[in-house]
């Protein structure tokens, strides 16, 4: 992607480094429980059980597919932007070194890719995790046409800094000639700031699922 090498301010450069705790990386301010490799399907910390969460995710994924089925045909260089933790990967409910895909989102993304959409991830995880993150995404069968990781300074700036970084990433994607037809995330900072035709919000239970 244009500026993907030089755009260090957006944290796009893929760097080989030991990964940080995945559960701490995509929040900008808070950490998640778990991270030991054991699943927490019963929820905890005020979260609902996995069965309720995945049902709610499936509802949003179906809404997104209905919209994209009408929008993708004829779109010029369509792209879908996604957050990663608890949007694309089951970071809270199934933490571990290789985090499983969220099945309804994976199915949506694979279908959209087959319809000609580029799949671009914009995550709050620091850019030094990009290689690790991309390896996880591809291992669970996500297509990856682009991956933006945040500068380390973003994590210390809280949700406002995360929102600014993610907005700038979408501006950069548009600068590469893409039309962002959908932006999917589970936190307000994933979706605020515009530069997407439509947003789809997955549950975050008032910030408890970051």
Which residues fall in each region the model found?
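Second-shell loop/turn segments in exported
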Residues: 46-55, 93-99, 120-125, 156-160
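Non-catalytic pre-domain segments flanking phosphatase-related domains
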Residues: 2-82
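Short, acidic loop-to-helix structural element flanking the phosphoryl-transfer center
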Residues: 95-119, 127-131
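Surface-exposed patches in mature extracellular/periplasmic domains of secreted proteins
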Residues: 73-79, 119-125, 149, 181-184
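Solvent-exposed, polar/charged alpha-helical surfaces in well-ordered, non-transmembrane soluble domains
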Residues: 62, 66, 103-110, 131-135, ...
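C-terminal cap/substrate-recognition subdomain and adjoining C-terminal extension
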Residues: 26-27, 34, 130-210
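Asp-based phosphoryl-transfer active-site loop
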Residues: 78-95, 121
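Sec-exported extracytoplasmic/periplasmic mature domains
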Residues: 69, 73, 110-118, 127, ...
